[in-house]
Amino acid sequence: MSPSTLPAPAPGAASGCPPQIRRISPVPRVLRYPANSLVLVAGIPGAGKSTMLNRLFGMTGRESATVRTRAGVRVVDSQQSRNRLHPLLSAVHYPLWRPLMHLLHYLRILAALRRGGPVVVHESGTRGPVRRLLGWYCRRRGVEVHLLLIDSDPGDALRGQIQRGRQVAPRSHRTHVRRWRRLLAACPAGPGAVVPGARSLLLLDRGRAGDLAEIRFTPGPALPAPGGAAAGAVP
């Protein structure tokens, strides 16, 4: 089942989500995208992004570099950057080198895009300038952007942070939640309202993200340009 042929979304509600946000139900087992694509997996910290990517791409969470699968998919998770820097900076309080970790993560995303082929990226999505930069860079490279958003109740996300052993500061958590709600409010205007030039958008709640079995990249024609698609639907 390709993003362009997903069933019509059914109304759904999750905490903090505007009522007009709609989700695909049931969740497709396999998502297919054109080979020259960036799939941006976004959600607040603790939403389950790394958990899903580790499961789908056979990762452990201990990697310290971009993972390239046998199928040629490059998977870029911010935890890889943290793992790479930690041995060098473990004596320094993490908040002091967090900006360096983010910078390394963004540089690795750009490097993966320069190499071509499919790229899957872990990113909170709550930083507007980062979303705009990715949209601009992908347009320059001729790469399609597809959005896979994982929505989570803030309390569940906080518990997810505690479970993984990496908890963001309370103030930072509130900021992520506030920005995420603004992102969700923009979704009904179409994928391009979230990331300029994005071609598709799929919104899953935290629980249903576990139903997804595979993200597959296949040669084929590009999807039509977005034109005000509803959230959860794909043009």
Where are these regions (language model features)?
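N-terminal pre-Walker A segment at the start of P-loop NTPase domains
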Residues: 1-30
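Phosphate-binding P-loop
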Residues: 28-36, 112-114
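Conserved GTP-binding G-domain of TRAFAC-class P-loop NTPases and closely related GTPase folds
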Residues: 38, 47, 59-63, 70, ...
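Hydrophobic anchor at the beta1->P-loop junction of P-loop NTPases
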Residues: 41
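Conserved substrate/cofactor phosphate-moiety recognition/catalytic segment
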Residues: 51, 55-115, 156-158
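Conserved nucleotide-binding/hydrolysis micro-motifs of P-loop NTPases
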Residues: 80-83, 126, 151-156, 208-210
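Glycine-rich phosphate-binding loop used to anchor ATP phosphates in small-molecule kinases
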Residues: 96-145
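Conserved phosphate-donor/acceptor-positioning beta-strand/loop module used by diverse small-molecule
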Residues: 141-160
